[in-house]
């Protein structure tokens, strides 16, 4: 291959709507290592996820890169990804004889061992295995020198032909295996001289007593069960389990998508939907101390419906890491977020993971519907304030070091995400345009956690704060309730985002009674327009490669900074004349829109429909 890898085109060769296990066990057209193995859909999925290492180290547009990647799968991948260890067609292919130059030892090399040697340059064995010596060295390392232990191989993994090749004589003393050990072990040669009767007798005794402990002989002597073969991936079949749902996501993760599964749990509880929560850990850079739904977390699924509150790529990682057991026979719903205008072409294969998709906003729904082969349902998410937040109590400005007598605008973002999407610099620019340095009755609070100190946007924000004492930076990891108390201590939440899938932060600000200024684009428009938020006009702008995940061919909003500045001035003027509060009844309306009760009713209705359809089928 000479062209760069086009992931979407390669995945397009897989069958769709037959279940992930079956679809990903099919070979990818045009990707193979001749004489060793095809590259299967599951391989490509792993490679796609690992853009920081595997894509760099093993370019699939070269034969050597593909061979190196398959070697990595054998050496490391099968231990990291349960789904890979279950990829039966791959392992059956690797159990075949390697195609090598003929020699005394060539008939004992499997394709599995061939890939292992290719990936273990530290062994000093010619990776091409062209000579008899190299082939013998490979066999001895594997069966005679601990290789089987390094790879955690069992007797079930040793093909019958390889067993027969090495144990080719009824008498172990005269077998190829015994000769292999003698030729590579000078210590055995010295102790058991083969030209003497005593030496032969001693070697026979050693083979019987010591070899089973020092070598891989038991792998060759043990006969594995073959009457009942291992599970083979087949087109998806469902099981009939009791009413209820398994909610899957970052149960303890302190980030926005962790809130998705936590709010879904609260909605199910209020609606009387039986449920359990399966935790899937995010990256190590995410704090996992939110224990608000810990009482519902379990290790094993209990019900026949899965609702996966992760991104499509994290859902894929979940399948690859945990394997098929979590999904096999269960109706799986992908409650997937997305921010940009179009669903990524490179992610379309992920629809194989689900039976239907739930979209938390019309924005996501439209992006999904243009790409999805499975049904897409609009399912808004619940937004709930923690019990610790008392909206009737006095605000706590002094606690956060904020001035008591200013109109405060606030915005919060997670530095672990793409800062350019959240656009905090746009908020700073709008504030500076709205209010000259002589306007001392206003202030801007920028709350961030996990910022990248080297990020140029973050540096500009810090510089602006250093030059303008009205701008307050709070760079800290706060508990959820504390973040909301910070919001409540301010007057207006400003989000000049370029893209937003749902807009949970905006919704929380509304529940707290803050004025809201937000870009008139993204999932937030579902509730911002009806709620009377000040919406900022925008123009669609094409993204540059690397600006965001799957940016090629995408668009997002560029909010009008001048319009945002006018909105800030309007809020400040109104609040300076009188204490502006929510119109009568609007606070209650917000609770009706976002409440766990309202959302739980919608969930229950859809789940009941699914159970009824399942019963009829």
For each of these PLM feature ranges, what is it?
Residues 143, 224-236, 246-248, 266, ...:
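Extended catalytic core of nucleotide-activated donor transferases of GT-like folds
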Residues 253, 259-267, 275, 385-480, ...:
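Conserved catalytic-core segment of nucleotide-activated headgroup transferases in glycan assembly
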Residues 355-366, 373-391:
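Donor nucleotide-sugar binding/catalytic pocket of nucleotide-sugar-dependent glycosyltransferases
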Residues 478-490, 511, 543-546:
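Short acidic alpha-helix that forms the nucleotide-activated donor recognition element
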Residues 498:
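Aromatic "clamp/platform" in nucleotide-sugar-dependent glycosyltransferases that forms part
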Residues 515-518, 534-537:
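Short hydrophobic beta-strand element within catalytic cores of glycosyltransferases
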Residues 555-559, 563, 575-607:
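A charged, aromatic-enriched C-terminal amphipathic alpha-helix characteristic of glycosyltransferases
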């Amino acid at each position: 291959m000479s062209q760069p890898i086009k992931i979407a085109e390669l995945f397009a060769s897989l069958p769709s709507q037959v279940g992930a296990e079956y679809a990903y066990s099919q070979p990818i057209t045009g990707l193979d290592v001749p004489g060793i193995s095809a590259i299967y859909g599951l391989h490509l999925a792993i490679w796609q996820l690992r853009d920081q290492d595997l894509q760099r180290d093993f370019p699939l547009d070269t034969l050597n890169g593909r061979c190196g990647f398959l070697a990595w799968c054998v050496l490391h991948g099968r231990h990291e990804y349960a789904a890979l260890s279950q990829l039966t067609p791959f392992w059956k292919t690797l159990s075949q004889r390697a195609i090598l130059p003929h020699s005394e030892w060539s008939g004992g090399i499997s394709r599995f061992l061939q890939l292992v040697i290719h990936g273990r340059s530290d062994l000093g064995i010619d990776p091409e295995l062209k000579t008899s010596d190299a082939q013998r060295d490979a066999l001895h390392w594997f069966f005679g020198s601990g290789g089987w232990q390094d790879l955690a191989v069992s007797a079930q993994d040793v093909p019958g032909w390889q067993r027969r090749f090495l144990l080719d004589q009824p008498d172990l003393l005269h077998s190829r295996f015994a000769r292999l050990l003698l030729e590579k072990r000078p210590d055995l040669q010295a102790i058991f001289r083969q030209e003497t009767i005593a030496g032969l007798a001693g070697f026979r005794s050693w083979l019987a007593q010591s070899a089973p402990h020092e070598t891989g002989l038991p792998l060759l002597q043990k006969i594995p069960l073959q009457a009942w073969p291992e599970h083979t991936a087949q087109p998806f079949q469902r099981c009939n389990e009791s009413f209820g749902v398994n909610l899957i996501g970052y149960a303890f993760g302190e980030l926005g998508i962790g809130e998705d599964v936590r709010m879904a749990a609260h909605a199910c509880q209020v609606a009387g939907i039986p449920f359990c929560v399966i935790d899937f850990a995010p990256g190590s850079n995410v704090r996992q101390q939110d224990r608000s739904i810990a009482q519902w977390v379990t290790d094993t699924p209990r019900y026949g419906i899965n609702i996966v509150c992760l991104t499509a790529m994290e859902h894929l990682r979940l399948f690859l890491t945990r394997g098929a057991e979590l999904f096999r026979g269960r109706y799986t719903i992908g409650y997937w977020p997305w921010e940009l205008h179009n669903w990524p072409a490179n992610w379309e294969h992920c629809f194989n993971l689900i039976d239907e998709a739930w979209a938390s906003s019309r924005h996501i729904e439209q992006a999904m519907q243009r790409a999805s082969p499975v049904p897409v349902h609009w399912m808004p998410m619940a937004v709930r304030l923690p019990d610790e937040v008392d909206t009737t109590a006095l605000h706590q400005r002094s606690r956060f070091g904020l001035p008591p007598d200013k109109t405060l605008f606030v915005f919060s973002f997670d530095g672990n995400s793409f800062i350019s999407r959240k656009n905090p610099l746009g908020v700073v620019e709008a504030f500076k345009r709205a209010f000259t340095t002589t306007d001392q009755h206003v202030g801007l609070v920028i709350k961030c956690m996990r910022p990248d100190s080297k990020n140029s946007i973050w540096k500009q924000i810090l510089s602006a704060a250093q030059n303008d004492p009205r701008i307050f930076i709070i760079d800290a990891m706060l508990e959820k309730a504390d973040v909301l108390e910070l919001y409540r201590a301010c007057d207006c939440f400003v989000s000049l985002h370029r893209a937003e899938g749902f807009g949970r932060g905006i919704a929380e600000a509304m529940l707290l009674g803050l004025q809201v200024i937000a870009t008139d684009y993204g999932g937030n428009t579902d509730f911002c327009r009806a709620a009377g938020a000040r919406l900022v006009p925008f123009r669609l702008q094409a993204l540059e490669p690397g600006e965001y995940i799957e940016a090629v061919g995408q668009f997002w909003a560029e909010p009008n900074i001048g319009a945002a500045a006018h909105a800030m001035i309007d809020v400040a003027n109104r609040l300076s004349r009188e204490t502006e509060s929510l119109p009568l009844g609007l606070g209650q309306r917000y609770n009706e829109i976002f409440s766990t009760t309202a959302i739980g009713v919608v969930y229950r209705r859809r789940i009941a429909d699914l159970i009824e359809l399942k019963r009829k089928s």
